[in-house]
Regions:
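Core AdoMet radical
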Residues: 57-73, 77, 81-101, 112-128, ...
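N-terminal pre-triad scaffold of radical SAM enzymes
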Residues: 10-61, 71, 78-89, 218
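Acidic (Asp/Glu)-rich catalytic clusters
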Residues: 77-82, 109-114, 132-142, 173-180, ...
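Short amphipathic alpha-helical segment that frequently serves as the phosphate-/nucleotide-binding helix
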Residues: 37, 67-71, 103, 200, ...
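Conserved C-terminal portion of the radical SAM core fold
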Residues: 167-220
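Broad gene-expression machinery/nucleic-acid interaction feature
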Residues: 37, 144, 182
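Polybasic, low-complexity association/targeting segments
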Residues: 1-8
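Distinct, well-ordered alpha-helical segments
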Residues: 99-107, 128-138, 196-197
Length: 220
């Protein structure tokens, strides 16, 4: 962790009460239609996992944001995206990290997004537990969880400092599917420590493996 952090430049100052970005894109839905989909990029405390390939740390704070700040950010962003049918809540880390998003804010956000057809959250496989299904039930809508797989290369994945294994990812996927929650995966086209040729080969292998364990959608 310390070596990775030593390579980083200083963080910009962020307003804890405002999302650092939001956007609307037309995306293919599970039902086959192309729908306006909003993404809220939430400002919150930095993810504790310090992954080698992550550049999202620069959009985070060093300390936990005040109670109510995350819900206020979501409210602000949604007001600017009135026509969306689906929403992604991306927080440069893990939605179920209590230091990033408090249980109180998560509950408030659940009440706020229940009217959307789909809500997508991002989370580390090792933070997948019963809270995810509980949050889905509170929101009362379809929830997808997006997790960073990156690669299944047996030597490269440990070097990314994600502090997870492919088995961890598979177990988290199985837990989510058992709770009727769909899973998305992020896969690197060329992970570090690979040649271009190896990168393409292992990206394809990783996508195929992800689908084989139940992932519905892969982003590369």
């Amino acid at each position: 962790n310390s070596w990775i952090r030593s390579l980083r430049s200083p963080k910009p100052d962020l307003d804890a009460w405002k999302p650092y970005a939001f956007e609307v894109e037309d995306e293919l839905s599970r039902g086959g239609s192309v729908d306006p989909t909003g993404t809220v990029f939430i400002t919150n405390r930095e993810c504790p996992f310090t992954c080698l390939v992550c550049d999202l740390w620069q959009y985070t704070t060093d300390e936990s944001v005040p109670l109510g700040a995350v819900d206020a950010q979501v409210e602000t962003a949604l007001a600017m995206m009135p026509d969306i049918r689906h929403v992604k809540l991306y927080n440069a880390g893990n939605f179920f990290d209590d230091r990033a998003i408090t249980p109180e804010d998560r509950a408030a956000v659940a009440a706020r997004v229940g009217g959307f057809e789909t809500v997508v959250l991002e989370n580390h496989p090792n933070l997948v537990d019963d809270r995810v299904a509980g949050w889905r039930d509170t929101a009362g809508t379809n929830v997808d969880v997006a997790m960073g797989l990156e690669t299944i290369h047996p030597d490269v994945l440990p070097r990314l400092n994600k502090r997870m294994t492919a088995d961890d990812f598979e177990a988290a996927t199985a837990k989510l599917l058992a709770d009727d929650i769909s899973v998305r995966a992020f896969v690197l086209v060329r992970a570090p420590f690979m040649t271009d040729e190896e990168g393409v080969e292992w990206a394809c292998r990783s996508v195929e493996w992800a689908f084989s364990v139940g992932v519905e959608c892969c982003s590369v």
